[in-house]
Amino acid sequence: MNEQELKQMIEGILTEMSGGKTTETVEATPAKAITETVVTEGSIPDITEVDIKKQLLVPEPADREGYLKMKQMTPARLGLWRAGPRYKTETILRFRADHAVAQDSVFSYVSEDLVKEMNFTPVNTKCQDKDEYLTRPDLGREFDDEMVEVIRANTTKNAKLQIVVGDGLSSAAIEANIKDILPSIKQGLKMYNLDFDNIIFVKHCRVPSMDQIGEITGADVVCLLVGERPGLVTAESMSAYIAYKPTIGMPEARRTVISNIHSGGTPPVEAGAYIAELIHNMLEKKCSGIDLK
């Protein structure tokens, strides 16, 4: 077989192959119409505004009224529900939102405008910032020489009572309660012919800072109003620590404490009246803490 015959044979084979091949017709699929996204202006509901005491997420509870009655007695997160082993999305978001509020309260400061409005005398402990305040509680109990002089110059020596306000671990607690509780304390003290004048405001305040203030001023009673460590229930809880003639290094048992002062606990006006009564009793009995019967 010569070259020419080989070419003819190959062409024949190719012709047979192409001739026997069937072609399929593919119908073009029309393109789908593009749907335009419509954006509307609106607002997302604030889940932190929901009253947990009135919210019941359990579907078809056996005793709905009894469940809600129990929830009215506590701010605990009762009556939640789940998707499989997990909490519902709404529950998780509310938890994170409340946790964020607590964090913000710890790391924020009391407004300087409020300090000026209330005519407080501002001083600072040895802490330079929030990080040092949180990691070095010992520095939040002490004042340097400059601050000692500021305290001495702006207080009455050997007064019967010295009121101190401290930011503590919750600036929100001070901003939410201080305007209500101070007039209540003042009004209550009038019943016992007692009063107070200049109020010290302590930035980066730890509770034992009141002990050094007691030694500087020589006051018979020192009352510290300070922000409590915030939790998931509220970031606005304040405490009152009161001591008769406090001294540096004294045992904690010498302090009398009124805690949970906020709108959902002991109202500030009510707490103020009770604080005034305690101060009077301390001055009468010359003691505080567990010694105060």
Swiss-Prot record:
<protein>
    <recommendedName>
        <fullName>Ethanolamine ammonia-lyase small subunit</fullName>
        <ecNumber>4.3.1.7</ecNumber>
    </recommendedName>
</protein>
<dbReference type="GO" id="GO:0031419">
    <property type="term" value="F:cobalamin binding"/>
</dbReference>
<dbReference type="GO" id="GO:0031471">
    <property type="term" value="C:ethanolamine degradation polyhedral organelle"/>
</dbReference>
<feature type="binding site">
    <location>
        <position position="228"/>
    </location>
    <ligand>
        <name>adenosylcob(III)alamin</name>
    </ligand>
</feature>
<keyword id="KW-0456">Lyase</keyword>
<dbReference type="GO" id="GO:0009350">
    <property type="term" value="C:ethanolamine ammonia-lyase complex"/>
</dbReference>
<keyword id="KW-1283">Bacterial microcompartment</keyword>
<comment type="function">
    <text>Catalyzes the deamination of various vicinal amino-alcohols to oxo compounds. Allows this organism to utilize ethanolamine as the sole source of nitrogen and carbon in the presence of external vitamin B12.</text>
</comment>
<keyword id="KW-0170">Cobalt</keyword>
<comment type="subunit">
    <text>The basic unit is a heterodimer which dimerizes to form tetramers. The heterotetramers trimerize; 6 large subunits form a core ring with 6 small subunits projecting outwards.</text>
</comment>
<dbReference type="GO" id="GO:0006520">
    <property type="term" value="P:amino acid metabolic process"/>
</dbReference>
<dbReference type="GO" id="GO:0008851">
    <property type="term" value="F:ethanolamine ammonia-lyase activity"/>
</dbReference>
<dbReference type="InterPro" id="IPR042251">
    <property type="entry name" value="EutC_C"/>
</dbReference>
<feature type="binding site">
    <location>
        <position position="207"/>
    </location>
    <ligand>
        <name>adenosylcob(III)alamin</name>
    </ligand>
</feature>
<comment type="similarity">
    <text>Belongs to the EutC family.</text>
</comment>
<dbReference type="InterPro" id="IPR009246">
    <property type="entry name" value="EutC"/>
</dbReference>
<dbReference type="GO" id="GO:0046336">
    <property type="term" value="P:ethanolamine catabolic process"/>
</dbReference>
<dbReference type="Pfam" id="PF05985">
    <property type="entry name" value="EutC"/>
</dbReference>
<keyword id="KW-0846">Cobalamin</keyword>
<dbReference type="InterPro" id="IPR042255">
    <property type="entry name" value="EutC_N"/>
</dbReference>
<comment type="pathway">
    <text>Amine and polyamine degradation; ethanolamine degradation.</text>
</comment>
